[in-house]
Regions:
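Alpha/beta enzyme core
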Residues: 1-68, 74-85
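Extended, intrinsically disordered, low-complexity segments
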Residues: 71-111
Length: 111
């Protein structure tokens, strides 16, 4: 809390609070104390470990920004592993075609 207050006084645009806990109680306690200290800069949450919390509860507790930091990367790994296994098992990529984007889709994406 002290560090957040110092950052706020120094002109920080937001305060990102992270926690290794499995529940959001620690960050909710911080948010309540931060609000009492009359700091009005936005609070940012990164709910990686406390993933059961709903956005509405983060918002209700004073968080203005929610960052899902690495979920897309973590989701891509099982998909890549599945395609790699298919190619190794079948000795060709044809069997994995239904699981992947077409070349046309990728080209359109990067245009």
């Amino acid at each position: 809390l002290n560090r957040a207050e110092i950052y706020s006084k120094a002109g920080a645009d937001a305060i990102l609070i992270h926690s290794k806990e499995k529940t959001p109680s620690e960050i909710f306690t911080f948010a309540k104390a931060f609000k009492k200290s009359r700091n009005y800069i936005p609070l940012v949450s990164v709910p990686s470990t406390y993933s059961k919390v709903y956005e509405k509860d983060l918002i209700k507790n004073g968080f203005k920004i929610i960052i899902y930091a690495n979920h897309m990367m973590r989701a891509s790994y099982p998909a890549m592993l599945d395609v790699a296994k298919s190619i190794l098992i079948n000795k060709r990529s044809f069997n994995a075609e239904k699981k992947i984007s077409s070349i046309k889709e990728i080209i359109n994406l990067i245009k």
